[in-house]
Amino acid sequence: SAVCIPSGQPCPYSKYCCSGSCTYKTNENGNSVQRCD
């Protein structure tokens, strides 16, 4: 009954994203963070 994580939000694994895809992106501080696509 877990709610999926929306696009652009931090994610631990792809399976938790509404889109089913969680990839590394560079944030405004230049750090690499995983976010839902």
Curated annotation (Swiss-Prot):
Keywords: Calcium channel impairing toxin, Disulfide bond, Ion channel impairing toxin, Knottin, Neurotoxin, Secreted, Toxin, Voltage-gated calcium channel impairing toxin. It comes from the Eukaryota. GO terms for cellular component: extracellular region. One of its GO terms (biological process) is defense response. Disulfide bonds join 4-18, 11-22, 17-36. Expressed by the venom gland. It is found in: Secreted. The record marks 10, 27, 35 as: Critical for insecticidal activity. Its main location: secreted. GO terms for molecular function: calcium channel inhibitor activity; toxin activity. Inhibits insect, but not mammalian, voltage-gated calcium channels (Cav). The presence of a 'disulfide through disulfide knot' structurally defines this protein as a knottin. Belongs to the neurotoxin 08 (Shiva) family. 01 (omega toxin) subfamily. This is Omega-hexatoxin-Hv1f.
